[in-house]
């Protein structure tokens, strides 16, 4: 993203008549992510939320449909927020690298999701397109699962959990037939370790990829969410 905005700044400053054209397969998610990033970089908007709302409003043709046509995937919106931080706090530079050790994952409001206790889940952790860790809860493979029935939650404690740095993708599969969405999994998300504070990341339902969609809300209740807990190596 930083290379992209630097390239666009150079191009746009070369001639006032210059324009940029950004596209992807659908012209919504990935395109919107980069458009919103440029809107922040060029001082047209100060924050990620305003730029995302503006892009969605301009891209939605209300004469044809009221369906929102902006950036919808939460992880894409999250990275627009990361860019806002890089611009305002780090002078358009990457923040200092922050390696973290993943200790455990807590699934909130898990009743009715799969077997309702986390035992059907498989967790995959991917860095730079490489699978760096996998645990199978049913077999207690590389993890132990602790149902917290009183709090409607389940804790997956990773055994020899990975040390990760930079962009991290976390995918959840289910052996209990949970409906699949994008990436052919029930739910997943991306984050970057440099933006983790207090060794904890909490993502509510509307910040998880796939459960953010209203059509899934009969399964994923309003207080569904995922917490990840880290330690410093």
Each predicted region: which residue ranges?
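PTP/DSP superfamily signal
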Residues: 1-21, 26-233
């Amino acid at each position: 993203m930083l290379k992209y905005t630097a390239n666009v700044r150079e191009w746009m400053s070369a001639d006032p008549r210059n324009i940029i054209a950004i596209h992807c397969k659908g012209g919504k998610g990935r395109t919107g992510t980069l458009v919103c990033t440029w809107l922040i970089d060029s001082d047209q908007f100060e924050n990620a939320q305003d730029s995302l709302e503006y892009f969605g409003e301009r891209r939605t043709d209300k004469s044809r449909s009221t369906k929102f046509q902006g950036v919808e995937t939460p992880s894409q919106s999250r990275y627009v927020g990361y860019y806002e931080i890089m611009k305002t706090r780090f002078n358009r530079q990457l923040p200092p690298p922050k390696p973290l050790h993943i200790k455990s994952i807590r699934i909130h409001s898990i009743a009715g999701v799969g077997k309702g206790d986390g035992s059907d889940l498989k967790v995959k952790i991917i860095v730079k397109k490489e699978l760096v860790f996998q645990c199978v809860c049913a077999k207690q493979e590389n993890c132990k699962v602790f149902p917290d029935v009183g709090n409607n939650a389940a804790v997956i404690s990773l055994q020899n959990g990975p040390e990760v740095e930079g962009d991290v993708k976390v995918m959840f599969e289910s052996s209990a037939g949970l409906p699949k969405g994008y990436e052919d999994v029930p739910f997943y998300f991306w984050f970057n370790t440099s933006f983790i504070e207090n060794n904890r990341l909490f993502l509510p339902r509307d910040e998880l990829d796939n459960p953010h969609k209203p059509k899934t809300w009969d399964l994923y209740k309003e207080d569904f969410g995922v917490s990840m807990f880290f330690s410093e190596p």
